[in-house]
Amino acid sequence: MNFDVVIIGGGLAGLTCGIALQEQGKRCAIVNNGQAAMDFSTGSIDLLGRLPNGENVQKVDRALAGLSEQLPAHPYAKLGAERVLAKAKQFEGMAAKLNLGLAGSVEQNHARVTPLGGLRRTWLSPDSVPTVRPNEAFPYNNIVILGIEGYHDFQPQLLADNLKLQPQFAHCEIKPGFLTIPELDFLRRQSREFRSVHIAQTLEQKVNPASLINEIRQAASGADVVFLPACFGQNSQAFFNELQAATDFMLFELPTLPPSLLGGRQHNILRQYFERLGGVMMNGDRALRAEFEGNRVVKLFTRIHEDEPLAADNYVLASGSFFSNGLVAEFERIYEPVFGADIVQTERFDPSDHFTWTTRRFSAPQPYQSAGVVINTDCRVQKCGRFFDNLYAAGAVIGGFNGIELGCGSGVAVVTALTVADEIAEKSGG
C-alpha cells in the first residue's frame, strides 16, 4: 500500500500533522494502535508553563530565550522562538476552524481550575472550563459545586475547600452539593461501571433533559455559577451547551479522573476531520519494524501488514512516549522500538545507564521523563549519528524535555506536528 505520508500514532501530534498534510493535498495514513493520551487528558493544551529554573511563565514569547539558554536540547530551542510562536498561532486557527471550543491565546497563559481546586497555567482550555487571567479575580461571587451522588471521581467538598484558598476566589461564597439523577441507579450498583463515559452515555440516552435541568436548578438555587463534573456530553459539547442554555446561571465543567470526556471530544473531532479530508485511519494496527535504504525509510511493516508493508515518500513518528509504547524501557536500556532511533543523552541522563534514570526524591522530576529520540532543526530523526532523509518525529516521542515539569507536552505536540507538515510539503513542492 502506497501513500505520500505514513504517520505512526493517532494522538494530538499525529492527527494535527495528518490534517495539515491532507489540507495540502497529501495522501496520508495513520497507523493507530489504540487510545491516545488525549483520551485521558484534561482537554487543556499547555505551551510552556515553567522554565527549568522553576520560574513561572506568563508570556511565552518572553520566556523562549531563557528556555533555550537553560535547556538547549528542548525542541523549542531547536526550532527557534519565531517558528514556535508561528506554529502555535497556526494551531489556534486550526482549532477555531474545527470548532474545538478552545479559549486562550499564545499572547499570555491563563490559569484553569483543576479538579482538586488548584490553579494551573495553560495556553488553551475548553471554553466550558472555569479559568482566570493572571492577577484577576474570578468574575462571579456565588459558586455551587455539584457532584453526582455515588460518583467518587469528582469530590465537590474537597474542590470547594481548596478553591477557597486561592486568592482569585477569596471573595466567592462556595458551596458543595450533589445531584441524585435516579436514572443512574443501575450504574451505582456496579461501581466499576460508574465512570464518566458510562454516565455521559446514560445522561444523553435515558435521562429526560427537563428533569435534569430542574434538578440542577433546585440544587444550585441562588448561585451565579455552577461547576459540574465533565460527564455531560460524550462525543461533543452539544449536550452541555443545551443545559447551559436552559439555566439561569453560568455552567462550567471540570475534568474528572480518566478517561476524560474533554480530551476525548477533541480527539473525536480531529479524527473525524482527518477522515473527511480523505485520510486513512488504520485503527487497531501497530508498527513493528522498518526497512531502510541508506538514509531513507522505504517500507514499514505493521501487525496487520506484515506481508504487504506500507510504503511512502515520508514517514512521521508520532507514537508518543512510554504511555503508548512509543518508547520502551528495559532494565538496561531505553529504546525506540520501530526504527531504532538514537535516544537523547544529557549530563544527567544516559539511556543505557539505569542508575541515571531516577532521582532519590519520588515527587521530583525524574530524568527518564526527558527520554526520547534525537531530532534536528527540521524534526528529522537521527539513527547511529546520521539523520534520516524522510523520517520525522513529532510530539512526546521526541527527547530533551520533561513535558510534565515544564508544562509544554501538548504544545510540543502541535508545534512539532505543524513543523513536520511544513517540511514535508516544502520538500515535495506542496
From Swiss-Prot:
Pathway: Polyol metabolism; glycerol degradation via glycerol kinase pathway; glycerone phosphate from sn-glycerol 3-phosphate (anaerobic route): step 1/1. Gene3D superfamilies: FAD/NAD(P)-binding domain. Signal peptide: none annotated. Pfam families: FAD_binding_2. InterPro entries: FAD-dep_OxRdtase_2_FAD-bd, FAD-oxidoreductase_2, FAD/NAD-bd_sf, G3P_DH_GlpB_su. Its EC number is 1.1.5.3. Its cofactor is FMN. GO terms for biological process: glycerol catabolic process. One of its GO terms (molecular function) is glycerol-3-phosphate dehydrogenase (quinone) activity. Disulfide bonds: none annotated. It catalyses: a quinone + sn-glycerol 3-phosphate = dihydroxyacetone phosphate + a quinol. GO terms for cellular component: glycerol-3-phosphate dehydrogenase (FAD) complex. Keywords: Flavoprotein, FMN, Oxidoreductase. Composed of a catalytic GlpA/B dimer and of membrane bound GlpC. HAMAP family: Glycerol3P_GlpB. NCBIfam families: glycerol3P_GlpB (TIGR03378), PRK05329.1-1 (NF003718), PRK05329.1-2 (NF003719), PRK05329.1-3 (NF003720), PRK05329.1-4 (NF003721). Belongs to the anaerobic G-3-P dehydrogenase subunit B family. PANTHER family: ANAEROBIC GLYCEROL-3-PHOSPHATE DEHYDROGENASE SUBUNIT B, FUMARATE REDUCTASE. Conversion of glycerol 3-phosphate to dihydroxyacetone. Uses fumarate or nitrate as electron acceptor. This is Anaerobic glycerol-3-phosphate dehydrogenase subunit B. It comes from Actinobacillus succinogenes (strain ATCC 55618 / DSM 22257 / CCUG 43843 / 130Z). The lineage of its organism: Bacteria, Pseudomonadati, Pseudomonadota, Gammaproteobacteria, Pasteurellales. The gene is glpB.
